[in-house]
Regions:
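Short, solvent-exposed, charged loop/turn and helix-capping segments
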Residues: 63-86, 129-135
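Short amphipathic alpha-helical heptad-repeat segments
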Residues: 33-36, 58-62, 81-88
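Bacterial N-terminal signal peptides that target proteins for export
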Residues: 1-10
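Sec-dependent N-terminal signal peptides of Gram-positive bacterial secreted proteins and lipoproteins
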Residues: 12-16
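C-terminal amphipathic alpha-helix
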Residues: 24-58, 94-135
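Heptad-repeat alpha-helical coiled-coil/4-helix-bundle sensor or tether segments in soluble regions
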Residues: 85-97
Length: 135
């Protein structure tokens, strides 16, 4: 009987300790995927800034990425970082919109804003005791 109690107690502690990791980890994986892909597309778009069709495709992907992030489930352990994820993705979306409309200067400014907001996002995630994984 005592052994069963110890096993149940150990299981409870394990669940308690790692439940945040499971929820935070899933969110962080999704956030990292969204941020990394947005950053990659932004860098590729900067090289191909004159290609309107490429910019249109990147803009469409950026809109979808922002929409997906807007409806993600956010664990309370990481909730303070989520608005910054949205700002990162919004700046990438606006940058790709500028590229699609041939506004090179606006594109570069918004790309820089997205990069700066990503830095802030990563700092906040670290302050909360987490880290965006490398995906």
């Amino acid at each position: 009987m005592r052994r069963m109690s110890l096993i149940a107690y150990a299981s409870f502690l394990f669940t308690l300790c790692f439940s945040g990791l499971a929820f935070g980890g899933s969110y962080l994986d999704r956030a990292a995927l969204l941020v990394n892909e947005a950053g990659h597309e932004g860098n590729v778009l900067r090289i191909r800034l004159g290609d309107k069709e490429f910019a249109r495709v990147v803009h469409s992907l950026s809109q979808s990425r922002l929409e997906a992030a807007s409806h993600m489930q956010v664990p309370k352990e990481i909730a303070l970082a989520h608005p910054h994820l949205l700002m990162v993705l919004e700046n990438y979306e606006r940058a790709s919109d500028a590229a699609e409309h041939g506004e090179a200067q606006r594109f570069l400014v918004l790309l820089q804003k997205a990069t700066e907001e990503e830095r802030i996002l990563r700092l906040i995630v670290e302050q909360l005791g987490w880290q965006l994984p490398k995906i």
